[in-house]
């Protein structure tokens, strides 16, 4: 059997004519029925506004909030654009507006609240704005409060009207600006607490006069500030009658009867008033006069300079010159002032008499000074040949640079040996020195501010 090839033709059934007529008239019937029911139940008019429902108060409350944010009167906007609405919804909107602190009659803007709660704002984190409490406040179990937003920067200055600047006749002081409160008249009548209005004259700042080198004053009337009251204090003498003249009591009573005026703060102490005070030198002289009269100050005693003749005894030096330094006491001190002059030979021999002693004090033979000698004198030993430390003890001169102690003849630890040409830099820098001679004393001493020479008597 051979199979068929090609597509098979399908014949669709055609609906009967009755059903076609019913489907065409169905749409028309539905429209007619809709119009009939609308006419019967609607009174022939379509409703302009929707009927109030349970959701209308909430819808209009949010609309009222948006209207209040832009600053429009809520009641007028509802009456003009929304028409007559449910009284319950209008009462709800009015109550909400009253809670926000906004008056419908005035139409003022209410306070602006923060977008984040106070807790999140303080922590500087993003607030989730969940209601009634955000997630962070709910977690910490604290109250979620939205505070009033504050304007950043400096606060705005309050504008005062010009009516507040007018002064009252009872003398009250108003807190207005200085420019509006100042009077332009030259001689105003200041406000008095006693009811009187005296004319006060204040002196202006003095004007310098270059001709005589003095300072002159220019007295003229000065404008008074409205905030500067004057006190009228009348001090009357008990014996003064009502008709008595004020001049009879002298200028003191006249000055007491004059009104006392509070001058503005611009007036400083005038130079004429400053010149009325005596100078400082005269004040010190007046202060010193009674002190001088009670306790006269005597001249200070003059400081006597060391006189070498005061140290010279009555007797002259006698005996061998070998015992020149044998009479040196342990505690004897010789001061060397800077004003010492060059001594001659006779004065040097007289100075030797101070150091005479017997041979028993050989272990404590020394002469010392308590005054600082650095930069005043220096020392040198001349004529002591063949002398040295540990070699020959004849004719040696030891100078101790340490503290003043009892130094024996054999103790050399605190002393330095002086030869023919010694180095005296360390000795000159010391504060105290001691001289000790063993066997061959010097026969002559010469002293000047720069050098102390010890020589043999050849």
Curated annotation (Swiss-Prot):
The keyword Nucleotide-binding does not apply. Residues 167-186, 193-207, 223-235 have a biased composition (Polar residues). InterPro entries: OAF3, Zn2-C6_fun-type_DNA-bd_sf, Zn2Cys6_DnaBD. Residues 117-144 bind DNA. It holds the Pfam family Zn_clus. Gene3D superfamilies: Zn(2)-C6 fungal-type DNA-binding domain (4.10.240.10). It is found in: Nucleus. GO terms for molecular function: DNA binding; DNA-binding transcription factor activity, RNA polymerase II-specific; zinc ion binding. Coiled coil: none annotated. Keywords: DNA-binding, Metal-binding, Nucleus, Transcription, Transcription regulation, Zinc. Residues 153-256, 435-458 are annotated as: Disordered. Disruption phenotype: Significantly decreases 11'-deoxyverticillin A production. It comes from the Eukaryota. GO terms for cellular component: nucleus. Transcription factor; part of the gene cluster that mediates the biosynthesis of 11'-deoxyverticillin A, one of the dimeric epipolythiodioxopiperazines (ETPs) from the verticillin family that act as mycotoxins. 11'-deoxyverticillin A is required for normal conidiation. Directly binds the consensus motif 5'-(T/C)(C/A)(G/T)GN3CC(G/T)(A/G)(G/C)-3' localized in the upstream regions of the verticillin biosynthetic genes. PANTHER family: MONODICTYPHENONE CLUSTER TRANSCRIPTION FACTOR-RELATED, OLEATE-ACTIVATED TRANSCRIPTION FACTOR 1-RELATED. This is Transcription factor verZ. It comes from Clonostachys rogersoniana.
């Amino acid at each position: 059997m051979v199979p068929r090839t090609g597509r098979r033709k399908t014949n669709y059934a055609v609906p009967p004519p009755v059903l076609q007529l019913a489907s065409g008239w169905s749409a028309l019937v539905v429209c007619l029925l809709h119009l009939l029911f609308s006419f019967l139940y609607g009174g022939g008019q379509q409703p302009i506004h929707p009927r109030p429902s349970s959701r209308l108060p909430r819808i209009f409350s949010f609309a009222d909030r948006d209207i209040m944010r832009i600053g429009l009167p809520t009641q007028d906007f509802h009456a003009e654009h929304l028409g007559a609405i449910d009284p319950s919804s209008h009462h709800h909107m009015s109550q909400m507006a009253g809670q926000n602190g906004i008056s419908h009659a005035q139409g003022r803007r209410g306070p602006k609240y923060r977008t984040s709660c106070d807790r999140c704002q303080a922590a500087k984190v993003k607030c989730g704005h969940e209601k009634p409490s955000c997630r962070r406040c709910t977690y910490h179990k604290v109250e979620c409060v939205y505070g009033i937003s504050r304007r950043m920067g400096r606060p705005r200055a309050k504008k005062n009207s010009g009516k507040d600047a007018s002064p009252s006749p009872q003398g009250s002081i108003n807190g207005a600006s200085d420019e509006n409160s100042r009077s332009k008249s030259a001689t105003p009548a200041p406000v008095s607490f006693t009811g009187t209005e005296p004319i006060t004259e204040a002196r202006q700042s003095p004007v310098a006069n270059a001709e005589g080198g003095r300072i002159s004053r220019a007295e003229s009337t000065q404008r008074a500030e409205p905030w500067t009251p004057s006190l009228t204090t009348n001090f009357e003498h008990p014996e003064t009658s009502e008709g008595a003249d004020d001049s009879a009591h002298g200028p003191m009573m006249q000055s007491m009867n004059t009104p006392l005026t509070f001058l503005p703060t611009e007036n400083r102490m005038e130079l004429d008033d400053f010149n009325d005070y005596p100078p400082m030198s005269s004040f010190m002289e007046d202060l010193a006069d009674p002190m001088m009269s009670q306790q006269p100050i005597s001249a200070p005693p003059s400081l006597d300079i060391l006189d070498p003749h005061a140290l010279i005894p009555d007797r002259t030096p006698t005996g061998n010159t070998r015992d020149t330094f044998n009479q040196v006491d342990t505690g004897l001190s010789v001061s060397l002032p800077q004003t010492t002059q060059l001594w001659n030979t006779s004065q040097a021999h007289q100075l030797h008499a101070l150091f005479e002693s017997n041979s028993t004090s050989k272990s404590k033979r020394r002469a010392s000074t308590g005054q600082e000698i650095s930069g005043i004198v220096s020392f040198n030993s001349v004529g002591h040949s063949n002398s040295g430390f540990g070699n020959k003890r004849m004719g040696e001169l030891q100078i101790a640079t340490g503290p003043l102690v009892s130094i024996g003849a054999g103790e050399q630890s605190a002393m330095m040996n002086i030869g023919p040409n010694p180095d005296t830099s360390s000795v000159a820098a010391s504060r105290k020195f001691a001289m000790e001679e063993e066997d061959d004393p010097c026969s002559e001493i010469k002293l000047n501010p720069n050098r102390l020479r010890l020589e043999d008597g050849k």
